């Protein structure tokens, strides 16, 4: 039983640790990938492209050097990777890097065509080992004399006098040259036999044996339609060509427009037959062309991982299809070049056609073409949001006009509670449209300045928040008795709290009349926030004459009445140094402050080089002088045959000697005529 329990605990720990594991492939920030202890940054390079990076799971100890080639399943792009931990989604490992020479299989392939193999390096500035160049079959070998096709004089170039080049085939095999001008219907994968490890594909309408990237297929006699072989994922096209799947199988066709040899099946003349080629859709959209002439940006399917490396959400954005084909992405992640519909006039013969004329952008975007060839969908509409409509219905009390979800006007009940803020005189509490309480100036006229109700003892007449007269109890603690510092004075706010404010303040505006009724010795003021408060007048307040019990003192309250209030602080108990005295501040804290009386004089007679001081406890004592100034006795000038004099020092600072002793001679030969040594 204990064993089963331990297994269960271990299984739960395994599940928890697995749930908290880092998914390195989802990290799109290179710095975050470096910081993660479970992930490693791996660089990869496309053919003739700039280096990129990917975040993969692993460490520097486990992820060692291994040069490999991968193909992106979404756009058939081949990349070179130098780390064995590379596992980016959508990439399939295809081959190991090839040598910079013709392989034995390519030599056999060229021999079957009666040609010799020649390796041509890639012309870009940074070719990778995964696509260093291409092996091509060119010329006639020395032993091939069976060229059927009317060559004049048996020249090695295979050029016929009739103007067709390379039209001869030997033994029914695909003997057309690589120039792409074969006579239609001569070469076909159904009659082409490739060596082991190769399969047949149509390159420029010529049956060509290409290296298979999956083992076990491509036996002699298999065509491009054999199961497992007819796929762009297992086809390596020559440099400058792209793999296309159509109803006839797998074909390698030239990549890009403008190439000579109008082998396009669309019947177009000039321009770009693919309308989506120069259309830049916004993020979340991709270009589709279903009628062969109108490009339309449509929403991309929302899949979980349509872009694994933080690139463009539209897989067709980085795919260039050949003439007669256009890119489609139906599942949101796989870009595929499909034949364009054969329309009579997919592009006009004129060269000044507006690229935006056949582009439909999504809602909120419009087509823009700044370079004359690239159509781009950019956000449209005003730069500022439109003003909201005004609700104009007249609603009953406690209701307000609002727009419902359908945009219709209706009266709804206001659900907020009563406003609970306590506002100053002349203001009232309101709840705004966001439900927030605030004090606003009242629209009703202010109450009269004098409250005329006769109230009982220890009560006074006041106006409530609605302007009505009422008697309220007088509180004896409303005297502004804070001990404020110099330059400050005590004030009582409208809510009864006390505060110290700076005395030198700008006077309130003259049009704001202060309406608060203040006690004798006080006056009404409007502070910098527009609040009314009673402050001590600059004239002395009336003297308080009541005799109060111990720990109490006589005070004049806020309304001019005398009363005894309790003293809340005890006697100050701090022992302060001379010249200081103990005080209790407005917070009840004891502190030593400088006394306004002069400090006591020290009367002790002290020995030489000492002085009388009063210590921290008020006791007199003799201490050694801080500035022990030298005298002539200290120098012993007479023993040297010199005279001594006290010279004034031009420094007027505390603890500095006013004079210093100097030895001098009257003989100018000894001191250079200066008189001092």
Curated annotation (Swiss-Prot):
GO terms for cellular component: extracellular matrix; spore wall; transport vesicle. Disulfide bonds: none annotated. It is found in: Cytoplasmic vesicle, Secretory vesicle; Spore coat. The keyword Glycoprotein applies. Keywords: Cytoplasmic vesicle, Disulfide bond, Glycoprotein, Repeat, Signal, Sporulation. Residues 188-210, 231-253, 275-298, 315-338, 355-378, 418-440, 479-501, 515-535, 571-593 form the Follistatin-like domain. Residues 148-174 have a biased composition (Gly residues). Residues 175-184 have a biased composition (Low complexity). Its main location: cytoplasm. May contribute to the structure of the coat at the interface between the middle, cellulosic layer and the outer, electron-dense, proteinaceous layer. This is Spore coat protein SP87. It comes from Dictyostelium discoideum (Social amoeba). The gene is pspD.
């Amino acid at each position: 039983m204990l064993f089963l329990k331990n297994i269960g605990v271990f299984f739960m720990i395994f599940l928890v640790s697995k749930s908290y594991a880092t998914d390195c492939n989802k990290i799109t920030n290179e710095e975050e990938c470096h910081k993660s202890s479970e992930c490693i940054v791996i660089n990869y390079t496309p053919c003739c492209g700039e280096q990129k990076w990917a975040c993969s799971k692993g460490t520097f100890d486990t992820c060692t050097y291994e040069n490999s080639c991968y193909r992106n399943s979404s756009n058939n792009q081949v990349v070179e990777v130098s780390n064995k931990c590379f596992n980016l989604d959508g990439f399939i490992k295809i081959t190991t890097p090839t040598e910079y020479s013709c392989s034995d299989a390519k030599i056999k392939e060229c021999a079957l065509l009666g040609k010799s193999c020649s390796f041509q390096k890639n012309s870009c500035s940074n070719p990778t080992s995964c696509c260093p160049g291409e092996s091509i079959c060119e010329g006639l070998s020395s032993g091939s004399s069976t060229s059927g096709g009317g060559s004049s004089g048996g020249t090695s170039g295979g050029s016929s006098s009739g103007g067709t080049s390379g039209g001869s085939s030997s033994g029914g095999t695909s003997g057309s040259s690589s120039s792409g001008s074969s006579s239609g219907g001569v070469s076909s994968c159904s009659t082409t036999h490739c060596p082991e490890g190769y399969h047949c594909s149509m390159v420029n309408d010529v049956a060509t044996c290409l290296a298979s990237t999956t083992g076990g297929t491509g036996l002699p006699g298999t065509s491009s339609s054999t199961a497992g072989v007819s796929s762009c994922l297992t086809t390596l096209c020559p440099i400058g060509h792209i793999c296309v799947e159509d109803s006839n199988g797998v074909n390698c066709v030239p990549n890009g427009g403008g190439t000579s040899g109008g082998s396009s099946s669309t019947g177009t003349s000039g321009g770009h037959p693919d309308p989506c080629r120069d259309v830049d859709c916004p993020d979340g959209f991709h270009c589709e062309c279903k009628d062969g002439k109108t490009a339309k940006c449509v929403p991309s399917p929302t899949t979980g991982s349509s872009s694994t490396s933080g690139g463009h959400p539209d897989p067709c954005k980085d795919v260039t299809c050949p003439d007669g084909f256009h890119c489609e992405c139906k599942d949101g992640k796989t870009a595929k070049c499909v034949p364009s519909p054969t329309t009579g006039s997919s592009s006009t013969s004129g060269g000044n056609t507006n690229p935006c004329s056949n582009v439909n952008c999504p809602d909120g975007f419009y087509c823009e073409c700044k370079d004359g060839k690239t159509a781009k969908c950019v956000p449209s509409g005003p730069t500022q949001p439109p003003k909201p409509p005004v609700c104009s219905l007249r609603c009953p009390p406690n209701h307000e006009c609002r727009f419902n979800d359908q945009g219709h006007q209706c009266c709804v009940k206001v659900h907020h509670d009563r406003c609970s803020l306590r506002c100053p005189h002349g203001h009232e509490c309101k709840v705004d449209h966001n439900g927030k309480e605030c004090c606003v100036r009242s629209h009703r006229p202010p109450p009269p300045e004098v409250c005329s109700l006769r109230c009982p003892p220890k009560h006074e007449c006041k106006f409530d928040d609605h302007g009505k007269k009422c008697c309220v109890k007088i509180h004896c603690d409303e005297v502004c008795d804070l001990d404020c510092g110099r330059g400050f004075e005590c004030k009582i706010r409208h809510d009864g709290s006390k505060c110290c404010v700076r005395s030198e303040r700008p006077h309130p505006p003259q049009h704001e009349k202060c309406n608060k009724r203040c006690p004798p010795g006080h006056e009404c003021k409007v502070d910098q926030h527009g609040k009314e408060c009673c402050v001590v007048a600059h004239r002395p307040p009336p003297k308080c004459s009541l005799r109060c019990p111990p720990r109490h003192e006589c005070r004049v309250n806020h309304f001019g009445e005398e009363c005894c209030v309790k003293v809340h602080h005890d006697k100050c108990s701090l022992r302060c140094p001379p010249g200081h005295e103990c005080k209790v501040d407005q917070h009840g804290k004891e502190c030593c402050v400088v006394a306004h009386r002069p400090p006591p004089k020290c009367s002790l007679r002290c020995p030489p080089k000492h002085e009388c001081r009063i210590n921290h406890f008020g006791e007199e004592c003799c201490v050694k002088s801080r500035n022990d100034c030298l005298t002539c006795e200290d120098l012993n000038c007479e023993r040297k045959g010199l005279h001594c004099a006290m010279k004034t020092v031009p420094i007027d600072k505390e603890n500095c000697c006013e004079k210093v002793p100097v030895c001098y001679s009257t003989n100018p030969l000894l001191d250079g005529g200066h008189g001092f040594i």
